[in-house]
Amino acid sequence: MSLSRHALQDAAQRFGTPLYLYDAEELDAALWRVQRAFGDARIFYAMKANPNLNLLRRYAAAGVGFECVSLGELLRAEAAGAGGERMILNGPAKSDAEYAAAARLGATIVVDREEEVVLLPPGSRVLVRVNPAMTVSTHEHLATGTARSKFGLTPEQVPGTLAELRDAGHEVLGLHMHIGSAIEQAEDFTAAFARVTELRAHIGGLSVLNVGGGWSLNADLEGIAYEAHEAARVFGAELWVEPGRYLVASAGWLLTRVVGTKRTGRNFCLVDAGMTEFLRPMLYGASHPLYPMWDALATEVWDVAGPACESGDLIARGVPLPTPQRGHLLLIGEAGAYGASMSSTYLSRPRPAEVLWTGHDWQLLRRRETPQDIWAAEV
């Protein structure tokens, strides 16, 4: 962790808690690691991980494109300064408004099911998503390439769909795949690439092979990149990748304050952030590193619990911490992805502010919501 206690205390005093923090140096370092590993592959940031407009502008200035899964994300990419050639519209259930926006912007559309052939705007530029139907090393809610997944076409459906798209006058670039998120084993990617390349005998060469993202934070990027380039080479295709969590997770933290403790057979450390600010531990069973910003002689085992009136509002269970007291600051690591982007206004709790550490000061990226912001659209 590159942030000092003094800097964190300063952030809490200036912006309050809960508070999302990002480190500009680590954002740049993560992108550099991807660029180094994947070489000349085109990078499209999966903005669902963290769509803050300031981060998007940063990536756009670095030449990164954007993978979008909604009208709002397409418009965010446009607002960040990206042209349509750097946008991909993905998703299993696209709306008419999303098709229209993709056509206006000139974005590449990922065809996720056979009936999309007749729904596409005329002359669309497309990729066809193939589902390799395999089990991967991640939480079931994060696996998108299993046989039971709602995403993509079966390998058997791909040749006919490609032919229909060409007959309909669309520009077919190639194939798309994405097997999940936070995948631990590089072998999963090797197996998925192998299944996709089996299609070469049935569909011929391609202009593009998009292999998605989904790499865990400690993944062997060089090994995955080598296998991905080999798969693209089978088709004679340019390689595209879609990192999301890998680019932003380690560059972000959630700063929360202890509001009290409770001992009722279990020790509860009660903090001012919970499921409304940080849903991943509850939704995916995700484990995140905790950094107590206090010292104490005694260390005990604690459950870290949020303020929501839900039994499942637990950030962590059974973790060793120095004995906490009201007012102490607790830092939650690897929170830059699917943290702020999945925060909600459940219980009419305003969403947190977001700030960036530039190396010498804090830059406000998003102000803290007010209660009035929450009901402003209600009539």
From Swiss-Prot:
Gene3D superfamilies: Alanine racemase (3.20.20.10), Lyase, Ornithine Decarboxylase, Chain A, domain 1 (2.40.37.10). One of its GO terms (biological process) is lysine biosynthetic process via diaminopimelate. GO terms for molecular function: diaminopimelate decarboxylase activity; pyridoxal phosphate binding. Pyridoxal 5'-phosphate binds at residues 214, 242-245, 338. Transmembrane segments: none annotated. Its EC number is 4.1.1.20. NCBIfam families: lysA. Specifically catalyzes the decarboxylation of meso-diaminopimelate (meso-DAP) to L-lysine. Belongs to the Orn/Lys/Arg decarboxylase class-II family. LysA subfamily. This is Diaminopimelate decarboxylase. It comes from Deinococcus radiodurans (strain ATCC 13939 / DSM 20539 / JCM 16871 / CCUG 27074 / LMG 4051 / NBRC 15346 / NCIMB 9279 / VKM B-1422 / R1). The gene is lysA.
